[in-house]
Amino acid sequence: MHVQELLFVAAILVPQCLRALRYSQGTGDENCETLKSEIHLIKEEFDELGRMQRTCNADVIVNKCEGLCNSQVQPSVITPTGFLKECYCCRESFLKEKVITLTHCYDPDGTRLTSPEMGSMDIRLREPTECKCFKCGDFTR
């Protein structure tokens, strides 16, 4: 491509890109938020020889990130594909450890365990307490 052609393409594309950028920044329709979600957790416990000792499960409420983030694709004379992509994803910005008690425990034969030491199991997991929009694929935070 000659210099004159590049200047012509740039003269046409740059104003369109700026309009697209202004439009995407001005919409304000991001709504990334922390929501409650019910999930079914199952945890198996094994002895040192790898034999299953018990299985515990429960339906629990945990936090999740959900929502929309502004993303855009705009023409570009610089990138090899001809488009510059800026994608943003709704993800956790802060995690907190939570202890959950699984209250339905069974032996390998499927018999319900009711003793205080075997009838329930505490597990730890990390759940989001805050969510916000981050550049997609950016795991450095």
Swiss-Prot record:
Chief location of this protein?
secreted
Keywords of the record, alphabetical order, are: Disulfide bond, Hormone, Secreted, Signal
Q: List the disulfide bonds.
A: C32-C90, C56-C105, C65-C131, C69-C133, C87-C136
Gene Ontology CC: bursicon neuropeptide hormone complex; extracellular region
Tissue occurrence:
Coexpressed with CCAP in most CCAP-specific neurons. Coexpressed with Burs in 4 bilateral neurons in thoracic and abdominal neuromeres of the ventral nervous system.
Which biological processes are named by the entry's GO terms? chitin-based cuticle sclerotization; ecdysis, chitin-based cuticle; G protein-coupled receptor signaling pathway
Name any one GO molecular function: neuropeptide hormone activity
Q: Which residues form the signal peptide?
A: 1-20
The record ties this protein, via InterPro entries, to: Bursicon_suB, Cystine-knot_cytokine
User: CTCK domain location, by residue?
Assistant: 32-127
Q: Where in the cell is it found?
A: Secreted
The function of this protein is: Final heterodimeric neurohormone released at the end of the molting cycle, involved in the sclerotization (tanning) of the insect cuticle, melanization and wing spreading. Heterodimer specifically activates the G protein-coupled receptor rk.
Quaternary structure (record): Heterodimer with Burs; 2 cystine knot polypeptides.
Protein name stated in the entry: Partner of bursicon
The record lists the organism as Drosophila melanogaster
